[in-house]
Design a protein with these regions (language model features):
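Short beta-strand elements of ligand-binding domains
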Residues: 113-115
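N-terminal pre-domain/capping segments
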Residues: 1-111
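Surface-exposed cleft-lining segments at the edges of enzyme active sites
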Residues: 117-120
Length: 120
């Protein structure tokens, strides 16, 4: 029986409610108020991405916007949440494992989840 479970949401679910940093902060606070403890960050939503990636993800129903410009570490902490993991595409993990590890360490986490696809 699990007795100490962290309830978290995936950042990719928040694309439409994180159009600017203020809206992202408000959304994260609402997530905390709804009973969540944490968030799984998405690698291509916490780093600046190209226009093409933003358009492809938007067309796929997963708008990522310009969230890569936000200070996600501060936003998550201010909302009282924790980062549970980062999910990253397999191509980036294979090409830049040390960069992915440093990113995880920056957020104080030890888990990186593979999205199962290569970056666009």
């Amino acid at each position: 029986m699990i007795t100490n479970m962290t309830k978290a949401i995936q950042q990719i679910m928040l694309g439409t409610v994180t159009k600017n940093e203020k809206q992202a902060a408000e959304s994260l606070k609402r997530i905390k108020a709804a009973g969540y403890d944490g968030i799984e960050l998405n690698g291509f939503m916490i780093k600046p991405t190209s226009f093409l990636v933003r358009m492809l993800t938007k067309a796929a129903g997963m708008p990522v916007g310009k969230g890569g410009d936000y200070d996600w570490n501060a936003l998550v902490k201010e909302a009282g949440l924790v980062v549970t993991s980062i999910h990253e595409d397999l191509g980036t993990i294979k090409r830049e494992p040390e960069t992915v590890i440093r990113e995880a360490e920056k957020f104080g986490i030890k888990y990186v989840v593979i999205t199962g696809m290569y970056r666009f």
